[in-house]
Structure formats: C-alpha cells, structure tokens
C-alpha cells in the first residue's frame, strides 16, 4: 500500500470539461486539510496532548499548518502514530546516545523507514527529511499525505475512531446564513484565492510530469515555468494567512494590513511575470510535445490548445491584477469604520504598487530581449562592444532624417535605443 499521490484519468477530454472555470474546493486547501488532520489525529491516544503542548509553547498564535508542522518536527509524535498500529516490533525512540537536537530527525527517519519497510509505502511517495525540516510547503504536503495514509490504516483496522464523523458541518451551517456585502466580497477573496492556489498546484504537477518524462529540454522547462515553485510556496502561505483571518470575527478582520505586511513577499512574482514573452514563445515552439505529455484529465484539459495552457501560465498576473479590485470593493461596499477603511486604502495602495513593480520588471525584460535581438541583426558593430553600452533604457521605431535624405527628399525609418552614458 502507498500514500495516494493523485491518480490520472485516461478518459477523453469532453466538451463539457472546463478546468479554467472550476471553483477551488475548500477541503483541498492546506489550511483546511490541516484542520481536518488535527481532528483525525485527536483519535490517536496521546497525540492531542502533544499538539496542545506545542500550541502553548509557541510565542505567538499558530495557524493549523504551522502547528502540525512544528509538532511533526519533534519526531516522537510520528513514532507514537506508527506504534498505534500495534506492530509486532514497534519503533523505539532514539537512545540516549543521540544528541537532543538530533532526536527529532532520528525519530522522523525511523518513521519513514518503517512506513516503507513495514507498511509497503512507495518510497517515491514518502517524504524525505528536507520535506519536514525545510521551509517549502510542497514538501510539507508530502508529510501530510503520509500521515493521512497511516491514519487511514488505523481507521480501517478499527484501532481508532474516525473523528470526522462526529464533527459538526460548519460549512453547511454557514450557507444558511444571509451574508452582508462585506461578507460576500470577503467570500469571493477567499474562494478565488483557494481556486488560484489549486490551479498553481495543477501547473506544478504538470511541470513535474514534463520533467519526469523528459518531454522537453530543461532550458525549455525553465523558460515556460520559471520560478513557479517559489510562487506556489509563497501563495500557499498567503492563503493560510487569508484563511486564518477569515476565521476571525468580522470586527477583528483587517484585510488592508494583510496586504501591507505581505507586500515585499510579492516580489517573487517579478521574474515570473517578466518572463511572459519568453514563456509564450517557448509554449508555441514546444506545444505539440506538451500536449502529448499525458497525465490526469485536468492536465489534458489544460493543454487542449495553446491558449488554454498559456491562460493557466498567466494566472499569476491575473491574480495580482485582481487584488486591488477586491480591496476597492471592500472600501466602497464593506461598510468599514474609518480606521479599517484607512487600512484598506493602504492595502490597496500596496497591492497596486506590487502590480506596478511587476510591470516595470516586464519592461526591463523586454529591453533585454530587444538587445538580444539586436545582436543577431547587426552584422558589423564597427569595433564597438555591446556589453559596454550599459542597460538599454528606451527603444522604439522612429523616423531619422539624415543630410543625404534631405537632398533626396526621402526619410529613413530606424530603430533607435538609448543607454546610460559610460564614463
């Protein structure tokens, strides 16, 4: 048996499929997954006490993801989880000879090894120590998947109770309440954020498939997907914070400060969006290979045509463009007090500034591409070295009038660029 890694669907893509317009499932967000996972783990004798202890030791309030991440890093809770299966040879805690600061990793390693050797989990679907002790949410998703699979075995063997069956259906209860305009806008923010992250996750899975199958060269993979993994890692963390705020009472929520506080983190978008022309050019060149990569039904919908794939790849820019609009709606229709409105104004300004900085990055990349093209078009540089010209500041097509042109009455069209003066 192995942890589920998301199976593919070999059926044909039908006309009714429209992955572009799917709405994100709340239960698939890492925040909600960890809320449910903590509930499930509470059925393991002694586990909830460990989580509560970690919660109390924290210097600040922890979101559900950070809380479980820190708990699992202790190592011994994972051993506790495994030994609840009542194996013939339970995992023993590291002996006293292991340094205190190494016991967590030693315990976690024993847990993974036992999952592979004794439970038959596929090693490729298990996590490595970097996934647990690193800082990438994609790695922690693997940890969550393995822990969930062990819980599935415990429930199947009737060794613990499935705590989900006794939980109240809060989501259903919320649907029966009449929402204010403020709540409608916030719901749109949260729902579309979940959808966006799930679309990024789909893109990442497709990228991983392309790399695994060696569908296109590595340089082409980079030209298309660029720093997608970094964006997804950031955006998962941002969504965790969005969902944490959404849990608060309406009077406590401060969406403006969220964007002010996270503004600098959005810089991760600049290289990705600046790469859009190179991305589109590479997609056009490699599309037939990408279309034949296979994968899940969702992936094949995504590469049904060039426009569909490129539309997915441009979702980061579309999302950045959406934030100022949502904050603007909250300012106009949210019926906030003066202090919250001022914070929203500051948040909107921050979100707009992020968009401006990414547009500047696009301009810089366009000028770099213009210089690369110029190098291929000019045959004789008359002894000049392009590398010494400095950064191209401005370029365009202009009418240039030269003395010989005046004599003949003909104007010549030239492409002209300017660079900063060199001493």
For the regions a language model picked out, list residue spans one by one:
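Structured beta-rich ligand-binding regulatory domains in large eukaryotic signaling proteins
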Residues: 389-423
């Amino acid at each position: 048996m192995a942890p589920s890694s998301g199976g593919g669907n070999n059926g044909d893509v039908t006309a009714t499929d429209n992955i572009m317009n799917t709405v994100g499932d709340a239960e698939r967000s890492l925040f909600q997954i960890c809320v449910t996972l903590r509930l499930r783990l509470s059925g393991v004798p002694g586990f909830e006490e460990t989580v509560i202890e970690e919660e109390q030791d924290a210097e600040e309030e922890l979101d559900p993801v950070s809380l479980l991440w820190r708990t699992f890093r202790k190592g011994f809770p994972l051993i506790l989880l495994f030994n609840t299966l009542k194996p013939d040879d339970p995992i023993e805690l590291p002996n006293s000879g292991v340094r205190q600061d190494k016991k967590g990793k030693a315990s976690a390693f024993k847990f993974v090894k036992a999952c592979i050797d004794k439970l038959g989990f596929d090693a490729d679907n298990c996590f490595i120590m970097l996934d647990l002790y690193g800082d990438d949410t994609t790695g922690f998703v693997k940890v969550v998947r393995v822990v969930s699979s062990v819980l599935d075995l415990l429930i199947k063997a009737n060794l613990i109770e499935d705590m989900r069956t006794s939980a109240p259906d809060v989501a259903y209860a919320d649907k029966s309440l009449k929402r204010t305009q403020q709540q409608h806008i916030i719901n749109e923010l949260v729902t579309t954020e979940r959808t966006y992250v799930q679309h990024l996750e789909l893109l990442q899975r497709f990228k991983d498939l392309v790399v695994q199958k060696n569908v296109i060269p590595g340089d082409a993979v980079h030209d298309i997907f660029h720093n997608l993994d970094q964006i997804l890692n950031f955006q998962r963390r941002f969504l965790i914070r969005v969902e944490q705020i959404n849990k608060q009472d309406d009077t406590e929520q401060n969406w403006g400060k969220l964007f002010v506080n996270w503004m600098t983190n959005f810089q991760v978008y600049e290289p990705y969006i600046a790469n859009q022309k190179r991305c589109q050019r590479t997609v056009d060149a490699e599309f037939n290979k990408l279309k034949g990569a296979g994968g899940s039904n969702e992936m094949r919908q995504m590469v049904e045509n060039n426009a569909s794939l490129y539309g997915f790849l441009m979702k980061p820019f579309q999302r950045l463009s959406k934030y100022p609009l949502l904050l603007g709606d909250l300012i106009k229709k949210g019926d906030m007090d003066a202090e919250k409105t001022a914070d929203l104004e500051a948040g909107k300004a921050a979100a707009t500034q992020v968009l401006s900085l990414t547009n500047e990055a696009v301009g810089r990349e366009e000028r770099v591409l213009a210089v690369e093209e110029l190098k291929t078009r000019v045959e004789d540089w008359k002894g000049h070295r392009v590398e010494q010209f400095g950064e191209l500041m401005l370029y365009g097509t202009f009418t240039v009038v030269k003395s010989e042109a005046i004599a003949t009455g003909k104007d010549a069209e030239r492409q002209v660029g300017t660079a900063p003066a060199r001493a």
